[in-house]
Amino acid sequence: MAENNFPIYAECGGLMYLTKSIDYGSKKFKMLGVFDVTTKMQKRLKLNYTKAIVSHDCLISNATNTIHGHEFHFSELDDVPRDSKFAYDLSIGVGIKNKKDGLMQNNALASYMHVHFGRSTFAKKFVQNCIKNSRR
């Protein structure tokens, strides 16, 4: 579906599912491979509130908007390609790599950040993108 440009939105566990694999100690579990990265489980919890500026137009927002949320995970992504496109620049939180979060490829968006949808138009924008793509 990702290669056909259908909208895919994923947070945290969904992000992990869209990677090539999840490595857990000596075990490796194959995932979907939408993103050319590997998830590696860690012993240490990453728990933060998050605040980000949207750096690129994406499925849920136009660029320059501010997004709030949180992250809560025991994993990190390994071998993130240098040319990866990220939707968010974090001022608070860790994200995927170098305070960047929201991996983008085709019409897929996946992040460690759990976005707070309560007082925003992000859900509406996502639904509009889904409707637009359902009419193709």
Predicted regions and their residues:
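Amide-donor transfer/coupling interface in amidating biosynthetic enzymes
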Residues: 41-136
